[in-house]
Amino acid sequence: MKLLDLNNPFGAPVYHEESVSSTMETARFLAGQNEGHGTVITADFQEAGRGRLKRSWATERGKNLLFTVLLRYGDISSIPEALTLRTGLAVSLAIEDLAPALAGSVQVKWPNDVMVCSRKAAGILTETDGKNVFIGVGVNVNQRDFPGEYRSKAISIVEAVPDGAAWSAGIANEGARFGLLEKILFRLYEEIEKPKEASAALSLRATDSWRERLIRRLYKKGETVTFIPGAADSDTAVEGTFSGIGPGGELLIIPRGENEEKAFVNGELRVY
């Protein structure tokens, strides 16, 4: 396990492995070794990488950014609300930091994806053991070819940036992944640590700002969508207008033929 020379605002180490079963599993191991809040493990390849609902994550070795952040909160009541969505916001902002030409084209799809030009560029998986939180992130950075069904649904940053557009320093090479990682960590720190500091100092509700900023880049907001509540294979569907997200990150839909919003905590937003 190699220690990377990256600036981590959490003040914790960033480790790198060429190949792991999954960065999520390695992060759990590191938690057991008493690594601190904000420790990161990144890898060139995951042999058993997975996303939400145990879906596989198709990636070429060394082309994309794969990492997990270990966050220690002591007890579950201290975990920031809507952490997956707030991570999505951080990732989307970092992508625009990296590739300014994509500003306005990067959106967050409820509950855990980041879309670039209406195609999936990143996925987020958040797990907890009650005390520790593990945020797994996968971002398509330099991959240009995706297998099978992913070909029309996925996109990488290098594919999305227009020819001739300016990149942030270090982009379009192997170091781009780690440059993006550093930017994501800074954005994530701003989303989940700085608001707590401001709230404690000013007695303000820090959650208002993240929600408002997220709503402005919410994928399919204001459009007619199909939502599958609960399990992804459920035969129950809700059609209606996607009106936004609630204070805790819940999905808000105005069902077809109704006038009032309904809130959903989990389920699948069908957009393909």
Model-identified regions with their sequence ranges:
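Long, positively charged amphipathic alpha-helical accessory segments at protein N-termini or as interdomain linkers
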Residues: 9-10, 32, 74-105, 116-272
